[in-house]
Amino acid sequence: VLRPLLKACREGLRLETDYVSFTTPVAETRLIAPHTLVYTGMRWHVRAYCEKNGAYRDFVLSRLRGEPDVLDISEFSREADTGWNTRVNVIIEPDQRLTAEQKRIIEIDYGMQNGQLIVPSRGALVQYVLQRFQIDANKVESKASAQQIVVANLDALQPWLYH
């Protein structure tokens, strides 16, 4: 799987590959134009243009089936991937419901400066940053001691979150 994938990334080529997902659990042929391998801290993905969906997507490497076939040059490059090329900061703060003493503990735990941890990211990778910090953008824990940290700029990150 890796050899054709790396060749396609390096040379800007399209691939034909079988892929499974939660929404399509039976292998389905996809034509993709991969540009970058990404390790999220939990698993490997390839960032690629998906011809089926007409958009740049992340494909989990372990869900590729069989060996991909290398095709021709792709018109969809890394430079055209807005999500990849947009730089954003994920700003993490202690949950405001904590006491001042508890906030200070969290600030030290996470190496925060002025009560914030600023995590630079690409737009396309924001969701993985939140997962790494175990932050669910759609849920607030009822107890601040369970939540501990929150995203201060969640509204600005909405375009990059899965909905």
PLM regions and their residue ranges:
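Short glycine- and basic-residue-enriched patches
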Residues: 1-163
